């Protein structure tokens, strides 16, 4: 137990170390921060009824993610980007003891500690705990739902109403954090009920089912209010998203790609290995060394298990895998590492099935490879995390080409530290009322937001007004030795200041030039807020 406690403390350290400085702040995070800052300053009425958009669609998710961010902002009385990432950090940390409790439903205490310890130090779990994004807490809420759901069928638990309430709340929150959980969790639940239909009357009467549904409706109340006000606009977007999500590839191509990406990402979760080339080897190793053996053993244990509750644990593990694998087939060409956040604990569960099988064989010789494999998983993830931290630290000194920052498309090493150093420089350098800035679309909003936190009035350089005095700065990647700006020829570069991977160029319009004829139009939000609701 002491070793497990030490592992958990190490996992917390790896999630929280340099949390402020090394926080990822991109376009989505700045957009969300601006919304929460507005709510913190103006009151609860400015909380939105819907959450962020589901990637690549016009569908808005539920607002749970924003409400968690607002709670953090209210408690700390700050809309600083690090504060808004605290909920994701907290839920990532809490998922460790939760996974331990979940594992104890089937495994011994010792095996539960081993597997939860390996999960705690998973590189991908650490990386996604260190910034704010709506999918990041999926692993916690999926686990919480499965744990509460199993407790409803656990004969040793007397007070089941609380677990029905928790199951309903966690189901609702998880389905609001990512579109795919909205599709998979209902499927898993319904199929589980079909296999357990004989025990439903015993453990779930109609009153308990209504309580479960009532908790879901409660969390979805803002979404329902929005649909009433907008006459079902988001529902229309939901059906449009279902039609648009599938790719234009054939079914066979999608299945092959699904197998490949599942294998590659499974291998990534277990080992932290990131191949520089698009190799099939990690996928092959994952499928034949981990996924297929784990799935077959889960089925074998299910057939042999006499304890009805443990059978349910194994059934849920199998359904967890099958539901996500099958639902990912139509979108297999769009799969990214973040799609594995709802399943982040599952590879370690499968490792547990394999390790348990060999460990319980009569010959002790099998225990040696089991220990060796578990050690490789542990060391691999720790080393992968070390290399990632090394990349971020290097980006504070020079332009870099990161390999391990697999969070978003932009792999440039830019973190909050770069923006804050740039803001400090601009505040010292500029003595004028306005700061005109230019940056790529990925960093336009983050730059403005961080400058606003430093009490500077930042506007797009494209909104330059000849009659208003201001300072001009363009932001670019140090490695590219360039910056994003239309009509560059109409500006003189006065100086440039490097902050590791980020370079800030001080500009000045050439005399007699009018750089822009039209300003940058601010996008008008179509969001509905609680202040807009009139009963």
Predicted segments with their positions:
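Transmembrane-lumen/periplasm boundary regions of multi-pass, lipid-linked membrane glycan transferases
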Residues: 33-45, 67-68, 173, 182-304, ...
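Membrane-interface transmembrane helices that cradle and orient dolichyl/undecaprenyl
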Residues: 105-110, 145-164, 174
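Transmembrane-helix motifs of polytopic, lipid-linked glycan transferases
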Residues: 9, 86-107, 144, 148, ...
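Hydrophobic/aromatic-rich transmembrane helices and adjacent perimembrane loops
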Residues: 89, 128-129, 138, 183, ...
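Membrane-interface alpha helices of multi-pass inner-membrane proteins
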Residues: 163-178, 190, 217-218, 325
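Membrane-proximal, lumen/periplasm-facing interface regions of secretory-pathway glyco-
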Residues: 367-429, 438-454, 534
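Short acidic/glycine- and proline-prone juxtamembrane loop motifs at membrane-interface regions
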Residues: 85, 124-135
């Amino acid at each position: 137990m002491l070793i497990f406690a030490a592992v958990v403390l190490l996992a917390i350290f790896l999630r929280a170390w340099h949390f402020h400085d090394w926080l990822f702040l991109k376009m989505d995070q700045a957009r969300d921060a601006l919304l929460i800052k507005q709510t913190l300053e103006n009151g609860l009425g400015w909380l939105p009824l819907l959450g962020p958009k589901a990637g690549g669609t016009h569908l808005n998710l539920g607002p749970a993610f924003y409400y968690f961010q607002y709670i953090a902002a209210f408690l700390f009385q700050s809309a600083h980007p690090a504060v808004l990432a605290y909920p994701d950090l907290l839920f990532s940390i809490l998922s460790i003891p939760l996974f331990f409790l979940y594992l104890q439903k089937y495994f011994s205490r010792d095996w539960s500690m081993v597997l939860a310890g390996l999960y705690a130090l998973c590189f991908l779990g650490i990386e996604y705990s260190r910034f704010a994004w709506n999918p990041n807490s999926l692993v916690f809420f999926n686990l919480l739902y499965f744990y509460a759901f199993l407790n409803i069928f656990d004969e040793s638990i007397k007070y089941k109403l609380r677990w029905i309430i928790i199951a309903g709340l966690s189901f609702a929150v998880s389905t609001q954090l990512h579109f795919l959980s909205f599709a998979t969790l209902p499927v898993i639940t319904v199929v589980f009920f079909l296999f357990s239909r004989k025990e439903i009357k015993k453990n779930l009467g109609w009153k308990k089912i209504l309580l479960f549904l009532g908790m879901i409706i409660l969390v979805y109340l803002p979404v329902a209010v929005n649909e009433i006000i907008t006459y079902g606009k988001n529902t229309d977007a939901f059906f449009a998203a279902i039609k648009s999500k599938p790719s234009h590839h054939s079914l066979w191509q999608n299945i092959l790609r699904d197998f490949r990406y599942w294998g590659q990402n499974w291998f990534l979760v277990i080992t932290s290995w990131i191949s520089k080339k698009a190799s099939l080897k990690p996928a092959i190793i994952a499928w034949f060394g981990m996924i297929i053996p784990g799935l077959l053993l889960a089925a074998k244990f299910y057939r042999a298990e006499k304890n009805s509750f443990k059978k349910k644990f194994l059934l849920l593990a199998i359904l967890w895998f099958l539901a996500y694998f099958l639902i990912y087939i139509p979108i297999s060409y769009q799969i990214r590492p973040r799609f594995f956040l709802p399943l982040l604990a599952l590879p370690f569960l499968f490792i547990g099935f394999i390790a348990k099988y060999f460990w319980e064989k009569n010959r002790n010789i099998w225990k040696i490879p089991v220990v060796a494999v578990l050690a490789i998983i542990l060391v691999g993830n720790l080393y992968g995390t070390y290399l990632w931290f090394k990349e971020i630290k290097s980006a504070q000194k020079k332009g870099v080409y990161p390999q391990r920052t697999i969070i978003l498309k932009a792999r440039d090493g830019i973190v909050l530290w770069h923006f804050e150093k740039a803001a400090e420089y601009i505040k010292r350098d500029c003595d004028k009322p306005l700061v005109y800035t230019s940056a790529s679309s990925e960093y336009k909003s983050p730059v403005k937001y961080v400058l606003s936190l430093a009490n500077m009035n930042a506007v797009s350089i494209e909104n330059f007004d000849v009659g208003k005095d201001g300072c001009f700065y363009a932001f670019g990647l140090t490695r590219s030795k360039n910056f994003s700006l239309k009509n560059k020829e109409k500006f003189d570069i006065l100086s440039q200041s490097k902050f590791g991977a980020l370079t800030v160029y001080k500009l000045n319009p050439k005399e007699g030039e009018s750089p822009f004829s039209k300003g940058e139009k601010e996008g008008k939000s179509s969001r509905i807020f609680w202040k807009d609701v009139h009963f």
